[in-house]
Amino acid sequence: MCSSDLLFLLLSATALADEVIHIGIIQFAEHGSLDNCRVGFIEGLAEEGFVEGENVVFDVQNAQADTAISAQIADVMAGKYDMICAIATPAAMAAFNAAEDAGIPVIYTAVSDPVSAMLAGADGKNPGNITGTSDALPVEAQLKLIRALMPDATKIGILHTTSETNSDATLALYKELAPNYGFEIIDKGISTGADLPMALDALLPQVDCTTNLTDNTVVSYLAVVLEKSEEYGKPVFGSEIEQVINGCVASEGIEYTELGRQTGRMAARVLRGESAEDIPYETISNSYLYVNPDALAAYGLTVPAELSERAIDVAAE
């Protein structure tokens, strides 16, 4: 590198450090996994030198699981900030639509299937000034877990919001893989959280257990799901650690704070001058086995010896 190039980089870095960057964060709903993504995103940026209160200002807005509110927030943010971080698929879709004309980058996280959400192409290329991280569930690992804990089970119930693209893609994968493990998937769609009690009354008598997707509406109303499932004596398998902490029996899930940190590091690359369009979206490949001993005991379930070594007791966390 010649001296003039080095001088340019040093001057650019100094200018970036002196500039206060404004980032809007749209969180689609308020629940543990998305909260952890937000915390991790801010931590990941801080690790890269973009520190809240020093050279970054964050405006965090929650859409309360409402796609219309997501769009309104995104429209406002696109006109006033340097970057938008969108947490969950509906927020990411709204942010991309709003920011496209404004020319500001969108960094998303907790998007289960960026391709089906049209946030990435089938070839992995981004459709515009957008990139981020996917929280694609380890579906096969979850099916193996359910089979290990419930060797006689044949039918798994899945609740999903019909307007959430992320749920559609994961549900399709469950239906594709379930027969390999001797399961049939029975699903029930809802429009809003208010639909859950009736949907559960229809679904639970037909199944041996239920497993959650990263469906924002269902997860936001997890207490309703757990209460109804207890009435019917049907265990609920979660899709991440927070759900297990709150009463699901177990989960093969990713670590959402780390997913957020990974997203923050990607955002730092964009803030340093890389184009979001040129950065392929990323995933986390590691899954962790989380168990809730009290919930397992309530349903008479035990973790087999071959899984116990890697099982993480959420009560000890």
Set out the residue ranges of the language-model regions.
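Short, small-residue-biased leader/transition segments that mark boundaries at the very start
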Residues: 1-3
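Short hydrophobic alpha-helices and adjacent helix-cap/hinge residues
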Residues: 17-317
